[in-house]
Amino acid sequence: MAKKRGDAPAPDPIPQKAARKSRGAAFAIVIVALLFVGTFGWWKIAHRDRSPAASPIQGAAQSSPAPASTSQPKPAPLLPPLLEPEAQVFARYAGSQGCRECHAAQFELWAKSNHGNAERLPDKVMDAAAFSPERTFHHGTQDSVATLKDGKPVVKTLGFGGAHERYPITRVIGHDPLRQYLVERPGGRVQTLEVAFDPKRNQWFDVYGDEDRKPGEWGHWTGRGMGWNAMCASCHNTRLRKNYDGAKDTYRTTMAEMSVGCESCHGPMKAHVEWRKQHPQTKEADPTVQKLTRDQTFDTCGSCHARRRELTGDFVPGDSFAQHFQLTTVDESDLYFPDGQIRDELYEYGSFHGSKMHTAGVRCADCHDPHAAKPRVMGNALCLRCHTGAPGQIPDSTVIAPIIDPVAHSFHKADSAGAQCVNCHMPVTTYMQRHPRHDHGFTIPDPLLTKEHRVPNACNKCHTDKDTDWALSATEKWWGDKMKRPSRERAQTVAAARAGTLTSGVPLLTLLRNEPNGYWKASLIRLLGAWSADAEVARAFLEYAQHPDPLVRTAAVQALESIGGPLGDAAQKVLARRTEDNERAVRVAAVSALRAVPDATSRAFRELMHALDLAADQPMGQLQKGAWAQANGDTAGALAHFEKAVAWDPNSGGIRNEFARLLSGMGRAEDTLVQMQEAVRLEPTQAEFRFNLALAWNEAGNIRNAVREFEEAVKIDPRHARAWYNLGLAHSALGKAAEAVTALRKGEDAEPRDARIPYARATIHARLGQRADAREAAQRALTIQPEYQDAQQLLRQLGQ
């Protein structure tokens, strides 16, 4: 039935994803975004999409997408492998023992270090205390036993099939402060026990505390979340090849050397060892050795000490980080606090990349002895090597660090905890119950950010008996206006963007223009993705896609995927050029963002497929492959991957939510509802899941249940504009005009840039004979979107 002018907008289904078009950087982080079909769903389901509407039906301002592709990339002809065969690679490695003769001092430091003991075989001396005498220990609701059987270590614990069994220990990872023990399984799998040993306390414990994980869960030690092959091996060994066979779901994992050997950081050195043997007396430099730059060394550290997406599974020292990884930065998630402090397990590289120290030219080896894997100097003396005003401490840098007197600067007594630089600027977070790690973001403690946005501050971490106001009063007294610094403004803006309280992208765009640090530029670009429909923001993405920093280019390229309108063609041209970028991270981002089906023989496409296959042993990897298949018209393939992801991690609400989107697009309303009900059961406080469940209920024809879930969504997230809008339409459909108007006004407050919300309200006012209110709402819609034809027609009917 044709809709009459002035009628309330019909609750339109979300159009299915066309021509692999999705928003923002979703693919790089999780998956290529999918669309969820629901009678009320006029917005793409993505967390807090704040893009303004450009048309009354189709959603955020975007160019008209090409028709959905039903063709598949042509099978690639036989081409050289992307990775060199491992036999050829491993033949270039000498092993750490080959370095000992000439580099004895460095070797001895390394052999005792956490790197030297990153992974090893069980040792009768080193592991004696853990297994003899027999120990029984309690964790959660479980009891486990560590003992020796025939002189070899075993652990009896809750394992496969829910039974307590004895598992022989075949390897050990970690050294200080904890050691984890490995169990070999069929299919080349190696699993990491969740019970670990603390050698200093001489105590067994569970790395997950009292979470009490059980068999069948992804994160239980028997699950994929504790699989050594995928989760541990690459950073505990030298030049590892995971060798996952997706067809058989098996591994053939190999490595050049067990543990983090010399060549993990220096690269393959067999040619050097042989050259030195042939030239024992010469003082000439070995022509086979490549001396790494400071940034190459930094990227080598980052290859393991970073939260990142792996693209190759084959990093080698000397290569750039961006040739092998896409770095996790501050974004809309809660992995980082808004000021850049770590919240989740993020390691050091990312935080340090965003620090003033990195911008000033400091690199890892300036502070850390790379062979001992410990600080070069302990205490404040390490920081004061630079912060005395003396130049020349940082090679190749003209930056002179500000002079710091620890007592005068900290307002704490000499040698007290509060006068230690690291306690304020590198606060500690403990992971795995026993592993304290310093934050490498070198942030400034700011109780105001604690009060406003719950960002932790070092003052209250120490002074646990004092409140935030006490700490805030002290910092304002001691430092006054110095606290009003750019990093505070940045943190406040990031927090506002995450909370959905920014009414435009201008504050973020201003910060982006003025930010000197590439890491933070990339972070701000990712946060700006919600405003990609704004022409100024889109032009910024086009500009920064050419930035010299690959981290910035990657973020900008990912953001270009959502650009439509007049700049859509320009965005696609830039993406096409970036598929030939000199860094793989950018190429992979670009080819995944292009609308056109890529050439299966192109380097960028093959690299993307390799990255997808590399992650295919994990549920999220299957989700990525499924999303790619669905985006390219292979619904059957997508379904197979999504079903596998759910089977591998049945307790993930997020995976079930994504699966529901696919099922909805296939018209399987009943199955969609089942998956969304399960997602909400697993994670009942996720507003987006409640919203999607409401859409699923409506697809099933139960509008009253849909209303209930929309209401739950806005209780959890009062700024969920899509939920308010759809709640308003649902109330209107039930004849509850007053409730509909109230909900739509809430939606306008939450998203003041979308013209459809006030237009929907205008139609309800008009139907009720409230002409003045109808004119006001229609006029508001036209203020937002002057070309909105339905609103123009309604105003004419109302006699403007």
Q: What residue spans do the PLM features occupy?
A:
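Amphipathic alpha-helical scaffolding segments comprising HEAT/armadillo-like alpha-solenoid repeats
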Residues: L502-L512, A533-Q546, G565-T579, A600-H610, ...
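Structural signature of tandem alpha-helical TPR/SEL1-like repeats
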Residues: D534-E536, L567-A570, T601-E607, N632-K644, ...
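Structural marker of alpha-solenoid helical repeat scaffolds
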Residues: W531, H547, I563, D581, ...
